[in-house]
Amino acid sequence: MNTDKKAVTKKKVKRNVPQGNCYIQAGFGNVIVTMTDPTGATVSWSSAGHLGFKGSRKGTPFAAQVAAEDAAKKAMEAGMKSVDVYLKGPGAGREPAIRALAATGMRILSLKDVTPVPHNGCRPPKRRRI
């Protein structure tokens, strides 16, 4: 006899979002790309680590490109066609992520750099000596 109970899962709501926002967080160690609707609700997201890149490979331009493509494809399935892009962080994946978005056929309406700049806040990490 099979007495295992099936897990109850919510069905994903298909919604049509023609325009939205794309937030690219490009740090030195990883790249996170989030696609949202105009209200800020997440439509899709992806990151280099989520796609199987490990360690120092997560911060590479190629990893950023793959992450942006993945997030854009998921968003296009939800009907997204155009985005406002918000960039944050000093990472190497900034430019490749934007190029990958454009290459998937997503229309980029605007580009904004929202990298937080301290008014001389915390002391930065010491320089690496290799």
Swiss-Prot record:
Gene Ontology CC, one term? ribosome
Cross-referenced PROSITE patterns: RIBOSOMAL_S11
| InterPro entries listed in its UniProt record | Ribosomal_uS11 (IPR001971), Ribosomal_uS11_bac-type (IPR019981), Ribosomal_uS11_CS (IPR018102), Ribosomal_uS11_sf (IPR036967)
Q: Does the keyword Ribonucleoprotein apply?
A: yes
Pfam families referenced in this protein's UniProt entry, alphabetically = Ribosomal_S11 (PF00411)
The organism sits in which domain of life?
Bacteria
Q: Which residues form a coiled coil?
A: none
Query: A Gene Ontology molecular-function term?
Result: structural constituent of ribosome
Q: Which UniProt keywords apply?
A: Ribonucleoprotein, Ribosomal protein, RNA-binding, rRNA-binding
- GO terms, biological process: translation
Give all cystine bridges in this chain.
Answer: none
> Quick check: keyword Manganese in the entry?
no
- Known function: Located on the platform of the 30S subunit, it bridges several disparate RNA helices of the 16S rRNA. Forms part of the Shine-Dalgarno cleft in the 70S ribosome.
Provide the assembly information: Part of the 30S ribosomal subunit. Interacts with proteins S7 and S18. Binds to IF-3.
By its UniProt entry, which NCBIfam families does this protein fall under? PRK05309.1 (NF003698), uS11_bact (TIGR03632)
User: Which HAMAP family does the annotation name?
Assistant: Ribosomal_uS11
Name the family the entry cites.
Answer: Belongs to the universal ribosomal protein uS11 family.
- According to UniProt, the name of this protein is Small ribosomal subunit protein uS11
Give the gene symbol: rpsK
